[in-house]
Design a protein with these regions (language model features):
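Catalytic core of bacterial c-di-GMP phosphodiesterases, primarily the EAL and HD-GYP domains
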Residues: 6-79, 154
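A general structural detector for well-ordered alpha-helical segments in enzyme core domains, enriched
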Residues: 15, 19-22, 45-52, 78-86, ...
């Protein structure tokens, strides 16, 4: 029986290799590649990434990695320690589902973190009450001051897009924008 972390790392490796194939085959394509926090602690991961970046630097110039919050047991494994050996590769690392779970504001200060993907649940909550407490504006302003990309997920209408942009999102993602 394979350990859950090993199975996730195997899936992440397969998705990474498939993503690189697509990036090489389609020179104008830009991709976000999800990776589990536990995979980042796999000792083989930095070696694989280094090899792929060395062989396909232009492909990685058009890719970013979205660090997922799952699995929950990854909470005790510091993200900063996992990203440290990867810092020299010049890759973009975004915190996925920001505002929904275990990602903390402290992780936004990690030098390798270049973007936040604000979870759709925060958009829904703030849109429902017109962001009366300023939570969404706080997150987008915080990201902007740090020079980070801020994508708001779950945008499903023109009104939600306008709201997300008014709150300071640098990008939106969702069924409305055609990006899922």
């Amino acid at each position: 029986v394979q350990e859950p972390d090993a199975a996730l790392a195997e899936l992440d490796r397969a998705m990474l290799l498939r993503s690189v194939q697509r990036l090489v085959a389609e020179p104008t394509l830009r991709l976000s590649i999800n990776v589990c926090r536990t995979t980042l602690h796999d000792p083989e991961w930095p070696v694989l990434l280094q090899d792929l970046v060395d062989r396909h630097p232009s492909a990685f110039a058009r890719a970013v990695f979205e660090v997922t919050e799952w699995p929950i047991r990854a909470a005790h494994k510091p993200l900063k320690a996992a990203l440290a050996p990867l810092a020299g590769l010049g890759l973009g690392w975004w915190l996925d589902d920001f505002g929904a779970g275990l990602t903390s504001f402290n992780e936004t200060f990690i030098p390798s973190v270049t973007g936040l993907k604000v979870d759709r649940s925060l958009l829904r909550r703030c849109y429902a009450d017109a962001d009366q407490f300023g939570a969404l504006k706080l997150v987008t302003s915080f990201a902007r001051r740090q020079g980070k990309t801020c994508v708001i997920e779950g945008v499903e209408s023109a009104k939600e897009r306008d709201f997300a942009e008014a709150c300071g999102a640098s990008h939106v993602q969702g069924f409305f924008s055609g990006v899922v």
